[in-house]
Curated annotation (Swiss-Prot):
Subunit architecture: Monomer. Interacts with TAH18. Interacts with MIA40.
Any one annotated GO CC term: mitochondrial intermembrane space
InterPro entries: Anamorsin, CIAPIN1, Dre2_N
Gene name of the record: DRE2
Lineage: Eukaryota, Fungi, Dikarya, Ascomycota, Saccharomycotina
Residue numbers binding [2Fe-2S] cluster: C281, C295, C298, C300
UniProt name for this protein: Fe-S cluster assembly protein DRE2
Region N-terminal SAM-like domain, annotated ranges: 1-192
Length: 411
């Protein structure tokens, strides 16, 4: 029987530039499996007896970017070659770890130049970290251990089978539980039972009503009925809703009471017991001091007085602010008038300088013997001092006449 070992060789981009290094890496892989080299196009296949080794070489950047699609659960080994010794350049992203996990078969291994500071990410991806003895090289000692990431074999979950309950036979006979039986009644029995139920309900309701009425009489709610106050035994009459002593109030009597101002004695006695007048706030109760604030539901007029005081204060403030605004505007107008007068006076006091035609025609600044302190007036502004009379003029020759045109327009 022939068996095959599929190996994926992932190379760092810096390794691909050296062809000899790539061939050395391949030969080491073959030597580790004790096989002979036979190159067949894109993949290298070697056979020894009944074992076939398929070696696939890819650049890791193309695999991570998805340019090259590789089959899942296909490779027995994946070897990563990275010549960088620093740990920061050996870091493998989590997305690449997950892809390698999918490419490997169960119990497949990912080995080579692996990072040492990503063990947590490796375990979270699903790998198991194992240690293997590194192959002997010139710079390495025998027995040196390196980390290898192994894809574990999936464990089959145990299947729980439901079994039927065994029936045990015994000599003792057990009675089976049966549903309750209902007996159908005759018409006479139904009528008698209904009468008994109704009689019991009526007696219970009467007892409950009597007890409730007695409790109401004993509480403070008894002042609503005058008959209950006179009864000493706490019994309640059946005609509680009808009060013979209730007095009927006529609407005309109410109108007459307001018009007569208590002159009508009948109306006054009638309404004095029925009308409720609000109690005025007594200042003397608070030690002669006025209350700070009216009640929430004030009916004595204190709330209206407070609102009137607030409105009066607002009116006073508005008047004062209006007067202040008027005075401020008047002062601003006066200040503006003063400034205008000062500007007019300053313009009148200015002295105008006038030049004659002789002064404007020709001005000779280049008379020999008349030079500045620096002695380089004719050379230009770059060589003139701060107080030079020739500043702004072009270079000239000594004795040359300089004419100033349009000098009068600037005055």
């Amino acid at each position: 029987m022939t068996s095959s070992i599929n190996i994926l060789l992932l190379l760092h981009p810096t390794v691909v530039t050296d062809a000899q290094l790539v061939e050395q890496i391949k030969s080491k892989i073959y030597q580790s499996h004790n096989n002979n080299n036979n190159n067949n196009g894109g993949t290298t296949t070697t056979t020894t007896g009944t074992v076939n080794i398929n070696l696939n070489q890819q650049i890791i950047d193309r695999v991570t970017k998805g340019i090259i699609e590789l089959p899942y659960d296909y490779y027995d080994e994946i070897i990563y070659i990275n010549p960088n010794n620093e740990s920061q350049y050996r870091e493998i992203p989590i997305s690449l770890m997950q892809l390698i996990y999918k490419l490997l078969k169960s119990n497949g291994k990912f080995k080579g130049d692996l990072p040492l500071d990503q063990n947590l990410d490796v375990l979270m991806t699903g790998f198991i970290i194992e240690e293997e003895e590194k192959e002997k090289e010139e710079n390495n000692l025998e027995g040196e251990l390196v980390n290898v990431w192994v894809k574990p074999i999936p464990v089959d979950e145990p299947v729980v089978t439901l079994l039927k309950k065994k029936t045990t036979t015994s000599n003792t006979t057990t009675k089976k539980k049966s549903l309750p039986l209902f007996k159908k009644l005759n018409k006479d029995e139904i009528n008698n039972s209904d009468k008994d139920i109704n009689n019991d309900n009526i007696t219970n309701n009467n007892n409950n009503n009597n007890n409730n009425k007695r409790k109401l009489v004993e509480t403070k709610l008894t002042y609503f009925s005058s008959d209950d106050e006179n009864s000493s035994d706490g019994s309640v009459s059946e005609n509680d809703d009808i009060d013979d002593d209730d007095e009927l109030i006529d609407e005309n009597d109410l109108l007459n009471f307001n018009n007569n101002n208590n002159n009508n004695t009948n109306g006054g006695s009638l309404l004095s017991d029925k009308l409720i007048t609000p109690r005025k706030c007594d200042i003397s109760l608070n030690g002669g001091k006025k209350r700070k604030k009216a009640c929430k539901d004030c009916t004595c007029g204190l709330k209206e007085l407070e609102e009137l005081e607030v409105s009066n204060q607002q009116n006073l403030q508005d008047q004062i602010l209006g007067k202040l605004a008027q005075s401020a505007t008047l002062e601003a107008i006066k200040i503006e008038e003063r400034l205008k007068q000062q500007q007019q006076q300053q313009q009148q006091q200015k002295v105008k300088v006038k030049f004659t035609e002789e002064d404007l025609s020709e001005i000779d600044f280049t008379v020999q013997g008349k030079t500045g302190g620096c002695g380089s007036c004719a050379l230009g502004d770059a060589f003139r001092c701060d107080g030079c009379p020739y500043l702004g003029l072009p270079p000239f020759k000594p004795g040359e006449v300089v004419k100033l045109d349009g000098f009068g327009e600037d005055i």
